[in-house]
Curated annotation (Swiss-Prot):
Signal peptide: none annotated. The keyword Cytoplasm does not apply. Belongs to the ABC transporter superfamily. Lipooligosaccharide exporter (TC 3.A.1.102) family. InterPro entries: AAA+_ATPase, ABC_transporter-like_ATP-bd, ABC_transporter-like_CS, ABC_transporter_ATP-binding, ABC_transptNodI, P-loop_NTPase. It comes from Rhizobium sp. (strain N33). The complex is composed of two ATP-binding proteins (NodI) and two transmembrane proteins (NodJ). ATP binds at residues 38-45. Its EC number is 7.6.2.-. This is Nod factor export ATP-binding protein I. Residues 6-236 form the ABC transporter domain. It is found in: Cell inner membrane. Keywords: ATP-binding, Cell inner membrane, Cell membrane, Membrane, Nodulation, Nucleotide-binding, Translocase, Transport. It comes from the Bacteria. GO terms for cellular component: plasma membrane.
C-alpha cells in the first residue's frame, strides 16, 4: 500500500453560523495528484488552509506527511511547498531575488539557494527573465515563478490553491505541463480547482465538494463512468419541454439547464432521427466529461 501523505478524518469548520467544511474525510497517497473540485464557496480554500495549519478545524483530525496538524504542523511545513490562489511575489524584486529571499525563510544558506536557482529558473522557463523585476512579467510568468518559489526547499508535497485561475489557455497549459513533470518525479500534489478540464487532465483522484460536503470521490474516469456512462447530446433552441417529450423514449436521462437540453444516450443516432427536420435546433454530440458529473451532482435542474 502507498504511504499516505494526507489524511483527513471527520473534519468540520464553521465561521460564525456558516458551516464551511462538513465532516470531510479523505486520504492522499504519496506521489499522486488529488483534486478538490467545487464552485466558489465549496470550502476548498479553507481545506487548504487547514492542511497548512493556518486555520484550526472545529472537529476531526488532519495528518500531513505523518505529522498531526496543529501539534506538529510546523515540522510538516518544512517539507511542503505552497502555491496560493493569488500571487504574493515582491513586485520590486527581480525574479532571482524573489527566489533568494524565499529560500531564507526555510533556513537555507545563500550559497545553497544560489546553487538551486538555475534549475528552478529552467523549470519555470524563466532563464531569460532572471534579472527582470516581477512587475515586468506576464501573468503566466508570475504564476510559474510562484510555482518555482514553492519548490525552493525541494518539498515532498505541493499544496496548490486554484493554480491557473486568471491565466489564458496557453499559460494554463504550460502550468499543467510543469505539474505533470513534477508528478513524474514523485511529488505529491493536492490542488483546489473549479476548472473541470484541469481536474480531468491532472488528477489521479478527486473529491467533488459542495457547501463543504463531499458528494463523490474517485478517479475522473471512474466518476464519469459511474455517474454518466454514455454519450452526451446538447440541444440548443426550440421549446425544451416539448423536446423532452419527444426524445425521452430514446435516452437514459434528460436534463434541462436554462434553454439547453442535455441528453444522455447510448444511441445518439436515434435522437438525431427524432429531431431531424426541426428548424432552429443546434446539436452538439460529445463524450461525457467531469463537467457532466459535477453539474449532475451539484444540482442542474433535472427533468423527472
Amino acid at each position: 500500500m502507498s504511504k499516505v501523505a494526507i489524511d483527513l478524518a471527520g473534519v468540520k469548520k464553521s465561521f460564525g453560523d456558516k458551516l464551511v467544511v462538513n465532516g470531510l474525510s479523505f486520504t492522499v497517497a504519496s506521489g499522486e495528484c488529488f483534486g478538490l473540485l467545487g464552485p466558489n464557496g465549496a470550502g476548498k480554500s479553507t481545506i487548504a488552509r487547514m492542511l497548512l495549519g493556518m486555520t484550526v478545524p472545529d472537529a476531526g483530525k488532519i495528518t500531513v506527511l505523518g505529522e498531526p496538524v496543529g501539534a506538529r504542523s510546523r515540522l510538516a511545513r518544512k517539507s511542503i511547498g505552497v502555491v496560493p490562489q493569488f500571487d504574493n511575489l515582491d513586485q520590486e524584486f527581480t525574479v532571482r531575488e524573489n527566489l533568494l529571499v524565499f529560500g531564507r525563510y526555510f533556513g537555507m544558506s545563500t550559497r545553497k539557494i544560489k546553487e538551486v536557482i538555475p534549475s528552478l529558473l529552467e523549470f519555470a522557463r524563466l532563464e531569460s527573465k532572471a534579472d527582470a523585476r516581477v512587475g515586468e512579467l506576464s501573468g503566466g510568468m508570475k504564476r510559474r515563478l510562484t510555482l518555482a518559489r514553492a519548490l525552493i526547499n525541494d518539498p515532498q508535497l505541493l499544496v496548490m490553491d486554484e493554480p491557473t485561475t486568471g491565466l489564458d489557455p496557453h499559460a494554463r497549459h504550460l502550468i499543467w505541463e510543469r505539474l505533470r513533470f513534477l508528478l513524474a518525479r514523485g511529488k505529491t500534489i493536492i490542488l483546489t480547482t473549479h476548472f473541470m478540464e484541469e481536474a480531468e487532465r491532472l488528477c489521479d483522484r478527486l473529491c467533488v465538494l459542495e457547501h463543504g460536503r463531499k458528494l463523490a470521490e474517485g478517479s475522473p474516469h471512474a466518476l464519469i463512468e459511474e455517474h454518466i456512462g454514455c454519450q452526451v447530446i446538447e440541444i440548443f433552441g426550440g421549446n425544451p419541454q416539448e423536446l423532452v417529450s419527444l426524445i425521452r423514449p430514446y435516452v437514459q436521462r434528460v436534463e434541462v439547464s436554462g434553454e439547453t437540453l442535455f441528453c444522455y444516450t447510448a444511441d445518439p443516432e436515434q435522437v438525431r432521427v427524432q429531431l431531424r427536420g426541426r428548424a432552429g435546433l443546434r446539436l452538439l454530440e460529445r463524450p461525457p466529461s467531469l463537467e457532466d458529473v459535477f453539474l449532475r451532482l451539484t444540482g442542474r435542474e433535472m427533468e423527472k
